[in-house]
Amino acid sequence: MKPNYSIDIAINCFRPGGGMESYTFDLVRGLSAHGIKPTVFAAQIDTTVPEYRQVNTHHVNQKKIPKKLRPFFFSMQLAKLRQNRNIPLIACNPSDYADIFVCGGTHLGYLHNMGKTPNLLDRLIIRRNRTNYLTAKLVMAHSHLMQHELINLYGVPSEKIRVIHPPADTARFYTKPEEIPATRARYGFKDDETIFLFPSTGHTRKGLDLLAEFFEHTDLPIKLAVAGLPLPRPMNNVIELGFYKNMPELYRAADFTIMASLYEPFGLVGIESILCGTRVVFSDNMACTEVMNENAGFFFSRQNPETLAQAITQAVSLKQQGKHKITSPMQALTYNPTLTHHIDQTLNILY
């Protein structure tokens, strides 16, 4: 890719965060490595991050707009700022007329899987997303699950959708087996117990209730280690770790990573865990399982609790045999998770 090509990126907040904010930073770093300095249009811009030096910026001034309404005005403001700019747009937020609209989740899919009835704000979000999909030249779906929802819930033509799974930070998440004994000792993880790591910033959506029901009543030598939000109550066989910044270390120290999400448009947690050499025990509705093979771990159905018990029992058996760690993570995945590959795919559909 020639370094003089230009790209615009739209995002509400250009700052460290989760979801699309994190993905936008990935795009910026990846494009920079290709010699491309994109222009970011955002309402909030963090000038202290290294990525700021890799972009040009345009501030979308929303100070006079009520906070809840700001996302609905962003697209109109963006259009005015980009008048007469013959430069392709990658929308990482709900913006219209994108050359690539990045879909990392759908609101209708979220409401359906969470069993929620849409309120007025939800209906406005759904309406806004319909115009995003309608006016975009292409929609990048971060999973086949998203492709399915775009087609079946929103009526987006299949020929308009490209499935490109999101990248993982392979420079940060990797195996380091020599560290594991010391890290486990520091956390108090016992060698005769199988530790299942549950990273969660939303216990209901991530399926804590289903997992706790099993862990609290089992006689197996297992512990559920919860990283993230505090527990709603004390639980038998459950350890509360709190928020932890060094997630690669935590993934490596655990025997397995476990999750039973009600709705997971992709789930980079699974990819990150595998890259660190730790197999997963995941519900099969999580979209990241699309890119995993049988070497990645064990999978179960949320609709059948017996399959959860079977998966955990198999995991414990593998740990007791000393065969639970993955030595070649890439062989457990069916896609290339590197940022370089993701940027190549993105540029291929953009130009």
Label every PLM stretch briefly:
Residues 262:
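Aromatic "clamp/platform" in nucleotide-sugar-dependent glycosyltransferases that forms part
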Residues 151, 168-185, 192:
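Acidic anion/phosphate-binding donor-loop and adjacent secondary structure
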Residues 190-206, 212-215:
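Conserved donor-binding/catalytic core segment of Leloir-type glycosyltransferases
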Residues 294, 298-305, 314-320:
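Conserved acidic donor-binding segment of nucleotide-sugar-dependent glycosyltransferases
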Residues 279-282:
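Short hydrophobic beta-strand element within catalytic cores of glycosyltransferases
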Residues 243, 250-254:
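Short alpha-helical donor nucleotide-sugar binding micro-motif in glycosyltransferases
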Residues 145, 167:
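Carbohydrate-associated surface elements
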Residues 303, 320-350:
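A charged, aromatic-enriched C-terminal amphipathic alpha-helix characteristic of glycosyltransferases
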